[in-house]
Amino acid sequence: MLNELDRAIATHTEEAFRFLEELVRAPSTVGAEQAAMEIFVTEFESLGLSIERLPFSNAPLVDNRAGITPPADLLTDDRFQVLASTPGDGALLLLINGHMDVVPAESPELWTTPPFEPARRDGRMYGRGAADMKGGFAIGALALRALRDVEPDLFKNQRLGVLAVIEEECSGNGTLRSIAEQGVTAPEVVLLEPTDLGLMVGGVGVMWLDIRVVASSGHAQQADTSANAVDLGIRIVEGLRGWAVRVLSAEPEPSMDPGESPYNINLGRVHSGDWTSTAPSSAVFSVRVGYPRIWTPTGAEAEIRSAINGIADADADFPSRPVVTLTGFRAQGYLLDKDSVLSTDLAAAHLDAHGTSPLAFTLGSTTDARIYLNDFEIPAVCFGAVAHDMHGIDESVELQSIVDAARTLARFLLMRFLPDGARA
């Protein structure tokens, strides 16, 4: 059967690539994901799955596990998530999770081809979200289409769900809402994030915040007499980077190599000033902070605020302490045991498909796997394609890796759903 499976995957590969192209053509930055969701609906309906649109409120999620809701001006009305599931009654045996939201395509003029016009070059597909993570939906569709050919009754007795969520890139509230409000869950979850065909079993804590700095404003002719708000904000960011080095020394991430940098400080945006010859009176720095897995979000927030206050208090140029506001992620770190049944079975499926065992690793970032693991004690692992330049210019996914990941996923689904419990 497995040779038949690989032949079926090869037969349907081009369909999966065309599906991915359609998804990339539908810009789905946070707040405007519905057009891409409708493409997902059409594809998975064609696979015989039942579709349920899950309403998604733009109101803040009142839950101490939640992140901060995005600004209202980013959000469109009538947002929704989608659960596609195999027909039948009863609970899901397995859930496949993916996120439809993508990050903005900054400076499109720097891209080789427009970010929302998919382009195939040198064995890759380029476009915003092609790798992170619309390529994951192509993997899922390809595996299911091939399995329908070789095992049409595979899901007759047990149900599979494929969940497309939003707000993964800023809060994780999409996955949290799907569980807390709509009860979409299963005993195990596979998230089709890009992992270079490895098993991403863990991630560090991540917090988003805005740091507002105020300073004396005035004519540029007096700029040498005091630091302006932008200068002071840069000192805060550099101070945080030094703080992160000290945190790493005190609290290294044991699941990562010593040479890696898990607690990165990223300055993503700066808003300041209204005139070139005026020293700005205020500046807002949007910063992403990585922190140790063993810290809670509440504890991390306190540590970060204390660090920022300490930097300002030690610098006489600050007229007052910065104002810190949380803006998105309040994500605790997570780790799935690499020897868990989910990890070992998925690794076995990969070994059968490719003759090599996948690398299990922790990344210095976060995924929605943390919500299943930390908040609901559901085993969850990320597995997916080979990505390049995620969040950057000319983001791309290796097309062959979509096929390779589908071969692994299809075997894993056979392991879970064949009535005799056969292993790939």
Segments (PLM) and residue ranges:
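Metal-dependent amide/peptide-bond hydrolase catalytic core
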Residues: 1-4, 11, 46, 74-76, ...
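Acidic/His- and Gly-rich active-site-bordering loop/insert found
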Residues: 2-125, 153-156
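Residue-level signal for inorganic ion chemistry
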Residues: 23, 27, 44, 193, ...
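Short, conserved micro-motifs enriched in small and acidic residues
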Residues: 31, 123-138, 169, 224-231, ...
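Short beta-strand segments
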Residues: 97-98, 164-165, 190-193, 212-214, ...
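Acidic-glycine-rich active-site phosphate/pyrophosphate-binding loop
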Residues: 105-120, 201-212, 381
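Glycine/charged-rich beta-loop-alpha catalytic/anionic-binding loops adjacent to active sites
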Residues: 115-129, 214-215, 355, 387
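Acidic/histidine-rich catalytic neighborhood of metal-dependent amide-processing enzymes
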Residues: 125, 131-208, 417, 421-424
